[in-house]
């Protein structure tokens, strides 16, 4: 037994070999038998299955079986019209303990020393030349049924690795690896790559390569493996693992991407997976594939429809062009590798080089985990994995890392950036900023936004200070040298605050210090200048972040932004100023803004009705475009020698904003004591129209003792005098050419017309669709809201002697 365990050297083709590797047993999760019935097969497929089984039986790959295990077997016809036998091993795989992958990635052919001669071989039917452990064979039994059960079924079991078995790839790698280990031991100075059934040998001289290959042939045969004689490559160009290998250059094999099959998410996912696999050779920066990556966004259903956009089509064309022209280099095993980091658009690009020879490209993923990733952090994030990649390729850290930073910026990065400290941990090589002089990298689209230029980390001296605030009702405001309030559609306080900061950055073209009570917005604004913004399914948020970044980058002057806690009651000017900004978006201020937008009430009326300051009330009116254009300097309402009601009627000419139609005769009444006014739209100016107007006035103002009118026919008729007599009203008319009463009426007309125009053009009320409704809204504003010069109450309060307040009862 001991002699059997010792290495037993035998002679084969004149070369000393060792005992072949033994079969590798499987580990089972359970001892429970697995039996899946064989389904019926058509006669044609059944005949093909019998032929294939006999062929495998003759080759010794299967043997007759009486196993209590069974898996279904079937055949498929290949394009060549030949049949292929497959076994459905899903049920058996479920009870096998997985071994795990041994080669999680492809070996890089760039590590093959340049100018070394090569031989590449392919093992023939590798799975079928590797034996199963004897105790595992019965688990892979299958049945060939008979038509109509006219005879017993024929049963076989596999003696070699069956295709579709969970651990067949791992066992194949292990078995071939053990067969090649004596070759590696004896020819340690040769470079041997083994990936499944593909084997590449390189040696410094052709004689050394021949010796190595001769020994390898013997070891492969001794292990029971067979070399495919028609696939032996001994001259350039070599084809290995999808690459075309020459003496010094390596190129991707020429392929054409089919675009007509790209219809679903699954199609694009596979395409981009294949492109990503070859990108380290092609050198396509992340920014050049943004539109292709964007197609993967949206519905996660693999069958969800996707469309190839014109921009993405151009990017596929770029990939095809790179496949035709891209190349990397085989290395000099004695020279160290270096890492170059280029500040490309979107995210940095890494390049592994040796002297000036390109070895491999390195990129960051298109999407990030964090909402904002600083460009400096992206550089550090790229350096870390690329260092590990270089160690994986050659076993050593890069000799030098070249970055687009000055020595002082590198020093500051080590002090302030945690990502930088992690990415360059334990690095003992050189950090430089001098790039090699070569045209290889000139096509890269570089960015200048590496470190902040506009954003400052310390407060600016001799700069304006502006406080911002946003509310969940969509109102945003800032206060400082001037105040501004904006209504936005956002129902999030943070998004409203973001709009406030953007507005400040746009409005102040000078150095500024911004103080906000949103820590989230402050951090976002600090980082956004050089950050990669993570895509969000929220389009609204994407637009805000992109607008913030564009606004910051377009500025000509620096800014500083910091956070202040709201509602702390701390003493000092900062807290007070922040409260002032809060007040601008508070409920009282917002209600004042909304009322003015509806009615265009004057500043005194706003101050009287709401808990706002004079400055805030005036600012609301001054920021109204209608009130700025139409408001004239405030005049006193005029004085009449006696207290009475003045009446006037006249036809109003059609105004561009007032379409009165048939109701173009506006009758106006004004109380000389309170200046309370009442007006109605009528179709004429006869006595009947005057009486109708007065009854409307009585319903609002009550019945007056005196009425003063002009000498119009509607006021001098007997019918009108009889009407006044019934209501016990004294009537007088104005003295011709005496303007005391007439001036009040004319000013009232002008005030009413101006108010109507303002509300019609700039009011928020969409319900006032008829002339009388428009007139009533104007009268409500003038009587119940506005306060005029030298007055402390509204006209309605002056008339009744009571303070206006919301009605507490119900209108029935």
UniProtKB/Swiss-Prot annotation:
The keyword Nuclease applies. A motif (YXDD) lies at residues 195-198. Keywords: DNA-binding, Endonuclease, ERV, Hydrolase, Metal-binding, Multifunctional enzyme, Nuclease, Nucleotidyltransferase, RNA-directed DNA polymerase, Transferase, Transposable element, Zinc, Zinc-finger. It catalyses: DNA(n) + a 2'-deoxyribonucleoside 5'-triphosphate = DNA(n+1) + diphosphate; Endonucleolytic cleavage to 5'-phosphomonoester. It holds the Pfam family RVT_1. GO terms for molecular function: DNA binding; RNA stem-loop binding; RNA-directed DNA polymerase activity; RNA-DNA hybrid ribonuclease activity; zinc ion binding. Its EC number is 2.7.7.49, 3.1.26.4. A motif (LPQG) lies at residues 161-164. The keyword Transmembrane does not apply. Early post-infection, the reverse transcriptase converts the viral RNA genome into double-stranded viral DNA. The RNase H domain of the reverse transcriptase performs two functions. It degrades the RNA template and specifically removes the RNA primer from the RNA/DNA hybrid. Following nuclear import, the integrase catalyzes the insertion of the linear, double-stranded viral DNA into the host cell chromosome. Endogenous Pol proteins may have kept, lost or modified their original function during evolution. The LPQG and YXDD motifs are catalytically important and conserved among many retroviruses. This is Endogenous retrovirus group K member 18 Pol protein. It comes from Homo sapiens (Human).
